[in-house]
Amino acid sequence: MSLGSGFRENISHQDLVSNRRNVYNVIYETNYRTWRKSYMDLTKLSAYEIIEHRDLPDLKSEGALLKHKKSGARVLLISNDDENKVFNIGFRTPTTNSTGVPHIMEHTVLCGSEKFPTKDPFVELVKGSLNTFLNAMTYPDKTVYPVASCNEKDFQNLMDVYMDAVLHPNIYKHEEIFRQEGWNYHLEEADGELSYNGVVYNEMKGAFSSPDGVLDRMILNSLFPDTTYANESGGDPDVIPELTYEEYLNFHRTYYHPSNSYIYLYGNMDMEEKLNWLDQEYLSAYDKKEVDSEIHLQKPFEKMHDITKPYSIASNESTEDNTYLSYNKVIGTSLDEKLYLAFQILDYALLSAPGAPITKALLEAGIGKDISGSYDSSTYQPIFSIVAKNANEEQKAEFVKVIEDTLKGIVENGMDKKALEAGINYHEFRYREA
């Protein structure tokens, strides 16, 4: 076939460039698929059900979603030529109180396991592993354990340590792990005052003393009073000591099961080998079970709520120009991809771009000295927030009016096209670099 045979003199230069780009894309995709098909053949994996399997051309990757037949574990694969291999296992961990049990669990499962009984394998990995990333994080509704490494042997060891940690931790054998990481009674001297201590307890005391941290928690808790988000998954220092050892163990028994897990593998690796290893070493030992970890939706409020919460300042600080004002809205659900992308762009265009209309309007009105916005999609129902720092409490009504008047004006007159294009370009670059 001649590439030039279909062109005529009335085709524009732009059309020509577009067609040339399409030809290049076909050549690239053909080569890519040849490599992919010879690299990730999932048809021989009898232990797994293939739910979806497709190309991800924007990521130059191949993706697959599987379910382990016996245990019910879900597995997401992203196969490509990136040598920085990534593994993550996560569990949905809703909580009904603010004792911080998800956070304490995250700390304690990494304090020794059946295969790796050392007191603190996490510290040993930090010192001796070739990892490019090593962590564990507690969110308001989930707990995740991600690792990454460019070295195959090191990566395999990291997977083994983390899988054994979350499924076979030493917490059932040694109550002192819970006491050390969660909370315990502390007595400095025989005649001294009894106090609370513990790694998570002390960590959250620090977190609760931060004005920004107080505001973030207040936004989340107040917008979702009837859901798990009304509770502090990290733990409220005043409530943490209410957690008992047996309640803590029951939390692990309930939620740290493969049926409630999501496993993620990314990068250039033998995916079939990794999946077989997961099946034989861990998942095949578990039978599927029902785990009630559903994250419920918050019903809409009938009217806007107005909440005030004090925070501590230094004795030599003035209360003038020291108030945070925050305007917050719940926006759909995190499963709506188009809405998610739209608000990422709007957040930039409305509040971060040069001459951003809401930021400009608030500063011109003298409300706050630092205006910021955020679109937090880490929860089931994302939150769009506008925050004015270094403001005053008596400016609250004007703060709301300026924001809503500005938004009404944008609805009536439209947005600056260049600001929207800048937002699109900014996020497109971020996604391609990620």
Predicted features by range, described:
Residues S2, V17, D270-E272:
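Position-driven detector of the extreme protein N-terminus
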Residues L3-E9, D15:
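Low-complexity, intrinsically disordered Ser/Thr/Pro- and acidic-rich segments
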Residues E9, S18-R36:
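Short, positively charged and aromatic/hydrophobic N-terminal segments
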Residues W35-A47, P94, T108, G112-E302, ...:
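Charge-rich, well-structured scaffold segments of protease-associated domains
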Residues M40-D82:
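N- or domain-start disorder-to-order transition segments that initiate the globular core
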Residues E62-K69, H305-E317:
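Short acidic-hydrophobic surface loop/beta-edge motif
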Residues F91-T99:
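Short pre-active-site segment immediately N-terminal to the catalytic Zn-binding motif
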Residues T99-C111:
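Active-site recognition of the HExxH zinc-binding catalytic motif
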